[in-house]
């Protein structure tokens, strides 16, 4: 984990539109970052939302699921199994007046997240849960305990463009914590559920 090249080879995909430094992807420092949080007395610790809530999955046995349903399942798991009170925002931000607008959705969702955090200062983890988009012939799945399971990917937006540098209006004071969170989650998934995760994807936005 101390090797930058090792991290890039085994853990990360850095999109060509952005860049990362060796100081930022310091694996030892990231895994040692203390991200522990105490469970509050009935206070929410996690917020799940969907910038692109209209995303759906390929039909299986005639049924089509949505990414919002995945969020509902995750909320149930966190609360019933782990006792982590979770807020799930089921708003569809990418449909405006009946028209699909994936870009404007980030502004709408961002405003709602800010309001939710102001109302619920106990929240420590915010998850923007998406469905990936790939060719229909590609099946990104593995087997967990003999059951076919979709692979997941952790995604970090680092507010930086390769050619223009840091994006000032998108300054993120939590960038280092987010990078630590995704790497620690990646390592835990690898420990308990090998092959569940794809490489962490890093992009400018």
Kindly give the residue locations of the regions a language model identified:
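Non-catalytic propeptide/linker segments at domain boundaries
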Residues: 1-47, 57
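Soluble periplasmic/extracytoplasmic beta-strand elements of cell-envelope proteins
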Residues: 45-50, 125-130, 153-155
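Acidic/histidine-rich, surface-exposed loop or edge segments in extracytoplasmic proteins
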Residues: 50-61, 89-96, 156-157, 162-170
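A short, glycine/acidic-enriched catalytic loop
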Residues: 135-171
